Amino acid sequence: MSSIKKTLAFSLGTFFSRITGLVRDIILAKTFGASSTLDAYYVSIVFPFFLRRTFAEGAMSSAFMAIYKKLKNKEEKAQFTSAVLTSLGLVTLLIVFLSEVFPYFMASIFATGADEEVKSLAADLIRLTAPFITIVFVWAVFYSVHNASHRYFLPALTPMFSNVGVIVGCLFGDVRWAAAGFTIGGLAALLVLLPFGKFRYRPTFKGLGEFYRLFFGTFMTMAVSQVTTLIDVNVASFLDPGSLSLIQLSSRLYQLPLGIFGVAVSTVALSTLSESEGDFHENLKDFISKSLFLTLPSSIGLMALSERIISLLFGYGAFTHEDVKKSAQILFMYAIGLCFVSLFNLLSRAYHASKEVKTPFFATLLVSAVNISLDVILGFTMGASGIALATSVSYIAGFVFLTLRMKPSFDKKIFKISLASAVMGTVILLLRGSFKGNLGTIFLVLIGVFVYVLFSKLLKIEELEEILRRGSH
């Protein structure tokens, strides 16, 4: 299976998952608006998402894949999988226990500036979402097993179950049901990936030396990067009520193309580069082009249509016109750094694939230092949009750092991708005033896609040709 076919399989699964996530956010915004109630919900899922990112999309998958793919037979793979489940499973169970016993303390860590009402509600919700921590860890292990066997579609699809759980919970009109649905949906996602009848769990701690060496290096990198998320949440908790909700809703939109395209390319790159020998740098150059081909036009499109897109998706029910304007400003700032986040993640995965974890760790330290500093400066001067801008600037700095260290070769086709994206953005801006309302927004998006595909075809950008060729098979 070629890298573009793997990327498309992962992207398709992720697309369905992210679309259900978008529906989830629309329903959350419509039901609760940018309110203290929704703020409390987001506080309750901060830590489970932190662990999902470090395990499923970071330390666990990187360390697990690097070793699992080198093992020769099923017995070795089964023993290694059991050892990881045993050792880290006990750690997650302890975390769940502490979260259930001290939920108010957890809420206070993640939302220092929130009022007592928000913290108390968040504490109640944490008791419902905490079990997700162990669930998502076990899910992440089997997610990695599937990816190691080049099965990308189903694992990428499974996060949709948690989204569906939240959607169903919202139908009851109580945020507690939404939190419960979050955890129940996560359990459903795990059950789908479990290899019933093909894997027998045997408690063991054997053979984890190299895994932990890779895991802790990568985990520290990911943990440092996620500290910025906690700082984002804390700074937002000192701002106007609903600011955290606006940031979360806007960031989910910016993460939509990042998740469908950026994470897809990075995930496939980790698997491919882990097996690379002399063609490592050539493969990396190819993945850089693929990443930019998909994320650069997404970035420009989100900036050009930020308010129109927010209004189309969230401008209903309890979500006010003022909420729309504030969210659009936040989305614009996030979109500035979208392609740089994708490239930073890709270059970090390239280091992990070669079992070198120090450089991405220092790069993440830089990103975190810049982000935290700018969070405080811009967050308290610009408001919620300043927090988003801080994220973009910090990842630009991290990308520059990794580029200077790794010195990857960039394909000349990047100029063509930039030109096609610029033409697309210009056309959207010129036509924006001629297409009114939500239907007009949909037409503008379709026109943008058409223009980008057309100019990619005229400029003979290979990524488009490969996608069209694979899509026809």
UniProtKB/Swiss-Prot annotation:
What are the record keywords, sorted? Answer: Cell inner membrane, Cell membrane, Cell shape, Cell wall biogenesis/degradation, Membrane, Peptidoglycan synthesis, Transmembrane, Transmembrane helix, Transport
Q: Which domain of life is it from?
A: Bacteria
Q: Which GO annotations describe the biological process of this protein?
A: cell wall organization; lipid translocation; lipid-linked peptidoglycan transport; peptidoglycan biosynthetic process; regulation of cell shape
Q: Where in the cell is it found?
A: Cell inner membrane
| Gene Ontology CC terms, in alphabetical order | plasma membrane
User: Any transmembrane segments, and where?
Assistant: 31-51, 90-110, 125-145, 153-173, 177-197, 215-235, 253-273, 300-320, 327-347, 360-380, 382-402, 414-434, 439-459
Q: Which InterPro entries match?
A: Lipid_II_flippase_MurJ/MviN, MurJ
Q: How does it sit in the membrane?
A: Multi-pass membrane protein
State its role: Involved in peptidoglycan biosynthesis. Transports lipid-linked peptidoglycan precursors from the inner to the outer leaflet of the cytoplasmic membrane.
**Assigned protein family:** Belongs to the MurJ/MviN family.
Q: What is this protein called?
A: Probable lipid II flippase MurJ
Q: Give me the gene this protein comes from.
A: murJ
